[in-house]
Amino acid sequence: MRWREPLDAVRVVRRSLRDAWDALVAIAPINLAWAGLGLTLVLLPPATAALFESMHELASGRSPGIRDYIGSVRRRLVDGWAWALWGAAGLTIVGVNVRLDPDPTDPREWVSAAVAVLGILFGVSLLYVWPFLFLQPDRGLVPAIRNSILATLAAPLFAIVLAVLLALVVAVGAVLIAPLVLVVPGLICLVASHAVTDRLRAWGRIPPRFSEEASD
């Protein structure tokens, strides 16, 4: 039921926080590697894609390793940049159409507000892309993007609450610098993986392979 979506989003974030805490020793070096590679800018998209992959491993019940992470960075160079360009294009369109100086008397403000909401949903769909790709790796990036959009539109309230909770996590991490570097980037990826599997489970569409892994 749609009214349960906010509670489901809270449950997903709570589970992700617990998993991240339990695996802190394993994910802290990976987050530091992501931060270091991201400084080059050129490697930021594939490093981010690889971070999603490592956190998907954690969400599947396996312990991610730094060596596997570095290997994933190499594999995700092209897909990582394709995803980054897709995200940059969408967020640019949103940014151009959202007014930063709202005027309540201007009827166009409703359009601007609607675009802002669509921008939030688009941002969440970007987080969903990689979990969908890892669940069905043989289908490629484009179907994963399509599925991420459909999943976001199918549960918009879940996505918006998830975005608000992630914003709070980032805000807390910004105050506590060490957690921001050591935990928050990977935590966001972990939340995305748990969110996708939570929605698929709610719709009865968990891939058989993932169901077997989750039960191990």
Residue ranges and their predicted role:
Residues 121-125:
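Faces of alpha-helical transmembrane segments in polytopic inner-membrane proteins
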